[in-house]
Amino acid sequence: MKTLKVGIIGCGNIFPMHAASVMERDDAELVAVCDVKKDRADEKAEQLDTKSYYDYEEMMDTEQLDVVHICLPHYLHAPATAAATKRQIHVMTEKPMAINYDDAKAMIDGAKENGVTLGVIFQNRYNPGSQLIKNMLTSGELGAVKSGKLQVTWDRSDEYYQNSDWKGTWDKEGGGVIIDQAIHTMDLMRWFVDSELNYVDASISN
């Protein structure tokens, strides 16, 4: 069995979950971590007994990576993915995939052209409740799905947005609560009914 060599780009809040998921597997090895903040990269690397980098392209060029996990602010997902796919490195990126259609399409095209896999993190599909609903729908136990309604009631404190300079910004986050939290629920609906969206009708207020 091949052991996949993995690098993680971004050592922020979500980093520990990605690192743990890699290190608990017998078929994967965390060989390097990268962050533009040198102290943070060095701290995580020391904790996990791995190498630290401060430039993800340098990490990709130096290490023989099979996969990178991208844990960066939303607007940086596309350039980091492009850097990986052109080097024929598989990508697992945090959601959302990108902050606009053009970036998302470029990411998909780059992965296809270079024969690598591009994955996006939507972990709620693996929650026990989500699995139960999916199985009941797939088996026909609940009958045919005619319509669905999403309601998201998550709350985020002011501190959540104040702790970084990109959260809650259109140009870097890409759409506030819709793209940061509600995207999980929208993904579940698509997965439950096994269908893509035909049209979107939306409103927003504050």
PLM region descriptions:
Residues 1-48:
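N-terminal Rossmann-like dinucleotide-binding module
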Residues 53, 92, 117-119, 149, ...:
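Structural detector of well-ordered beta-strand residues that form the stable sheet scaffold
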Residues 124-206:
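Predominantly a Rossmann-like dinucleotide-binding segment in NAD(P)-dependent oxidoreductases
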Residues 18, 50-110:
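Beta-loop-alpha module in the N-terminal Rossmann-like domain of NAD(P)-dependent dehydrogenases
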Residues 106-123, 143-150:
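Rossmann-fold dehydrogenase core element
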Residues 28-32, 48, 66-68, 118, ...:
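Short active-site oxyanion
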